[in-house]
């Protein structure tokens, strides 16, 4: 038997034991085909052909996958061919299979390669995106002016079947927005992997990647919130310096976020909710969606009744003051008449 036949025999005997998660599909002179699997979404099919002058020349390698990025696979195939040159004159097949398996183990973020590429395009110069392959997480920092939000995004091993998680969050936005970033990010991630309670269609639910969904939300929020205006007074909600932002959640100038996403000062929101029109519920001046807020639980009928009562009270006070003014004027006139009469005597 020749060199290639000996190597093929060695591959067929040792592949399963030497390369973890491998399945030998074919092992003949025309092609060696091996499927290497760590998870359902981290599977690479290695297709190997022998060159004419093998083993004096490197193997011809093609990588395939149903879930991983084509661009990633093309780049890895080039690296594999360079790796083959280290073993010229020797058996190369098992060495390359072990190299591919090692690449999968050491780069757990390969399952979100395309998402990471998309995220990088949305970031600006002051933003940061750091890949930490060893810990299967991404360090994200988004900034607008002096405001920032940074967090560690953990990517689970069975991603995208399981969703990403936000950890170690830090920001200089007021506490209200920190809670919003984390809660909404968690909810968006959950929706990507859990079916809705009320299905709109009969189609089976399929989990979708959550990294880009969560990150895009965080980037958009941090970039736009410092430039938002109060929907009532139209003044900037957040001051240019985060240190001057109101953090007392009962203060008049504290920022309140509606479910539609628009912002109000607390004082402006209360004033707006207490004044007509009330029919059909109070609506956001910008998007016309009905306003729901945890600090305002009155129905439109009760709010209208209270407003009418306040107006009636105001009219009563005005009438009382007017009567008092008339009586006071009459008394003053009577005193003037008495004084004039005395002087005349």
Regions found by a protein language model. Give the residues of each.
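Extended serine/threonine-enriched, polar tracts that run as long, contiguous segments within proteins
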Residues: 137-158
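Short, low-complexity Ser/Thr-rich regulatory SLiMs
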Residues: 50-52, 155-157, 275
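PEST-like intrinsically disordered, low-complexity C-terminal regions enriched in Ser/Thr/Pro
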Residues: 302-345
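RING-type zinc-finger domain of E3 ubiquitin ligases
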Residues: 224-304
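Eukaryotic short linear interaction motifs
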Residues: 41, 53-57, 69-71, 148-150, ...
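Eukaryote-biased feature marking scaffold/signaling PDZ-domain proteins and nuclear chromatin regulators
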Residues: 6, 27-29, 41-43, 56, ...
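Glycine-centered motif in EGF-like
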Residues: 1-34, 54-140, 159-229
């Amino acid at each position: 038997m020749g060199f290639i036949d000996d190597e093929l025999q060695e591959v067929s005997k040792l592949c399963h034991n030497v390369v973890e998660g491998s399945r030998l599909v074919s092992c003949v002179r025309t092609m060696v085909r091996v499927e290497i699997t760590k998870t359902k979404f981290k599977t690479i099919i290695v297709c190997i052909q022998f060159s004419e002058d093998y083993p004096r020349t490197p193997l011809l390698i093609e990588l395939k996958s149903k879930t991983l990025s084509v661009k990633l696979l093309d780049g890895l195939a080039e690296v594999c061919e360079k790796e083959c040159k280290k073993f010229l004159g020797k058996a190369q097949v098992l060495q390359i299979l072990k190299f591919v398996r090692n690449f999968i183990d050491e780069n757990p973020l390969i399952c979100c390669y395309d998402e990471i590429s998309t995220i990088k395009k949305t970031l600006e110069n002051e933003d940061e995106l750091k890949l930490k392959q060893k810990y299967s997480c991404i360090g994200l920092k988004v900034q607008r002016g002096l405001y920032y939000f940074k967090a560690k995004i953990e990517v689970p091993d069975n991603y995208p079947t399981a969703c990403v998680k936000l950890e170690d969050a830090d920001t200089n936005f007021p506490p209200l927005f920190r809670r919003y970033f984390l809660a909404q990010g968690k909810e968006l991630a959950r929706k990507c992997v859990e079916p809705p309670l009320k299905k709109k269609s009969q189609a089976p639910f399929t989990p979708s990647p959550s990294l880009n969904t969560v990150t895009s939300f965080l980037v958009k929020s941090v970039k736009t919130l410092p430039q938002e205006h109060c929907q009532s007074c139209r003044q900037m909600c957040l001051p240019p310096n985060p240190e001057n932002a109101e953090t007392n959640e009962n203060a008049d100038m504290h920022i309140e976020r509606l479910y539609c996403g628009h912002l109000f000062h607390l004082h402006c929101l209360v004033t707006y909710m207490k004044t007509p029109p009330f029919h059909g519920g109070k609506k956001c001046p910008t998007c016309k969606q009905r306003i729901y807020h945890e600090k305002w639980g009155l129905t439109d009928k009760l709010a209208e009744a209270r407003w009418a009562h306040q107006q009636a009270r105001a009219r009563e006070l005005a009438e009382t003051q007017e009567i008092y003014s008339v009586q006071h004027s009459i008394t003053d006139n009577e005193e003037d008449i008495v004084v004039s009469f005395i002087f005349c005597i």
